Amino acid sequence: VTDGEFRRDWWHIDFLHGFDGVELSTGDIYGEAKFQGTHEQPPTMMVAGRIRRSKPSMLEHFKFLKSVVRKGLPKFTMPSPAMLHARADRASLKKVYPDVNELWADLTQCYREEIAELYHAGCRYLQIDDTTIAMWGDPKVQEQFRKLGDDPQKDAEMYTAAVNAAIRDVPDDMTVAIHTCRGNFKSAWVAEGGYEPVAEAMFSSGVDAFFMEFDSERAGGFAPLRYVPKGKKVVLGLVSSKTAQLESKDELKKRIEQAARHAPLENLCLSPQCGFSSTHHGNKLSHDEQWRKLERVVDVARQVWR
């Protein structure tokens, strides 16, 4: 059970802005790596100083969630540390951190401190949301980051290493999952392309489960699942949170069968491909349509894994 991120305007920016050294601007830094079909884009994160955690970023959010959950396990979501490197103004970042390794040292330390406090507050299920690694399957996005002087393959490895550093002190009784997609804003997305180019790097993450976007052809096929480490869970995001059309049970079962050719069925799960409202704007579907989709997920899961 999550809080739906109701206290956040933006699923990622609000959390990172809670750290010292991260400020916001209205400047346009996204170039071609923008959400398709909308002129509105997220605000720009600027790195104004060394990143520190002088106070909790969202500890109170979790405490509220835990106080109202009567049945089920409270799950807290936070953006991957990669989101700052990928989506912040690169000039401001390099000015403060000429050595990117120092950025990761400071940023992942903030994450470890936040996660430790969440754990002590009772959090036992953490989801890290990442819209960077999956985008490297899109040649246009790769080219955009090459213009910044990046090597997309090395970035994928670096971002996975950052996640591993952030969760390295997590106790054994805390489940950590990572959700990867290609952007979710007002039913729009940033990138297209499958997981194949980054599968090996992504699956080297030390998390317990991978939530993966597979709701449309732009997400590619299931073949990259052959790289999933033994015993790790894969949650197939087959139900779109971007459109109102309700997926048929037969089609969902068919796609689960296809995925099971590359990873054991007992290690697979089913979910929507992303959140229904990753920002305060929401997506282009009604509350009722949202609930029908969630019911469809539950019904199909019960039939497949009964």
What are these model-predicted stretches?
Residues V1-R306:
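Domain-level signal for soluble alpha/beta catalytic cores
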